């Protein structure tokens, strides 16, 4: 079954506002809410960065049905993977069957400002792989002893583990981490707007390859994608809203070494609107909007989490509930 989620953008909204939008999302019929976990936002002006862990506890207490998770949290530097394992086990006890841990390898802007080292890509991947293994071992075992290169445990126990296991989703944008997601994850996370070939020729084949190493197929995984969408009856307004998230359009080369939100904002604001909009499905017609979204379902994604860039999230949620979600559900019924 296709799941439709809401991205709670912690880089843009204060924690209480984000909580209110999460409650609205549940009322509007969304199936899930995934929150980002940043130490620092992409923009200094008007930026926010509430901590995901306490926020998820409040979200669990304020909702009844939606799946809640991170998209994503980095369990390698400012968080020790053992602390992450304990925190999400506790969340799983408090909201049984409604919590997911989404992990990624991170960005220097969330680690270096605390004086933490930012290793090269090879070490970051090795840390990431080892952190996932420790989290899963702590969730599964009574007493865990591991002597790793980066993380160790000696007779470590998580005493409060949920009866319903917490799924672990692995975010990736390249083939190596995507193979890891297929091999060890319960789900896979990526983002939209990067060109069809990346998904069909690189990521999904790598995911299938990794799954096969664990005697699984893609049907055994939740294929989640963050959908960057800007939908508004006023097309110019939909375009302009993408400027709030111009940093997403910066290349990795343009962002390398940029760890200050003030500088990131300066670089993003220098981009033309055509470029800031390049990562987004920008639409003023609901049928055209759904058609463009559906192309990702046709690729094989089973869980679409919608991220809208505008300040008025209540208006986005209302419009999506009235005009987009019903069309997507109807489309799903037609093809099932």
From Swiss-Prot:
Substrate binds at residues 191, 194, 255, 279. GO terms for biological process: carbohydrate metabolic process. It catalyses: oxidized coenzyme F420-(gamma-L-Glu)(n) + D-glucose 6-phosphate + H(+) = 6-phospho-D-glucono-1,5-lactone + reduced coenzyme F420-(gamma-L-Glu)(n). It holds the Pfam family Bac_luciferase. Keywords: Carbohydrate metabolism, Oxidoreductase. Its EC number is 1.1.98.2. It is an enzyme of class 1 (oxidoreductase). GO terms for molecular function: coenzyme F420 binding; glucose-6-phosphate dehydrogenase (coenzyme F420) activity; oxidoreductase activity, acting on paired donors, with incorporation or reduction of molecular oxygen. It comes from the Bacteria. The active site is at 38 (proton donor), 107 (proton acceptor). Coenzyme F420-(gamma-Glu)n binds at residues 37, 74, 105-106, 110, 173-174, 176-177. The keyword GTP-binding does not apply. InterPro entries: F420-dep_G6P_DH (IPR019944), F420-G6PD/mer (IPR050564), F420_G6P_DH-rel (IPR019945), Luciferase-like_dom (IPR011251), Luciferase-like_sf (IPR036661). PANTHER family: 5,10-METHYLENETETRAHYDROMETHANOPTERIN REDUCTASE, PTHR43244. Belongs to the F420-dependent glucose-6-phosphate dehydrogenase family. Homodimer. Catalyzes the coenzyme F420-dependent oxidation of glucose 6-phosphate (G6P) to 6-phosphogluconolactone. This is F420-dependent glucose-6-phosphate dehydrogenase. It comes from Beutenbergia cavernae (strain ATCC BAA-8 / DSM 12333 / CCUG 43141 / JCM 11478 / NBRC 16432 / NCIMB 13614 / HKI 0122).
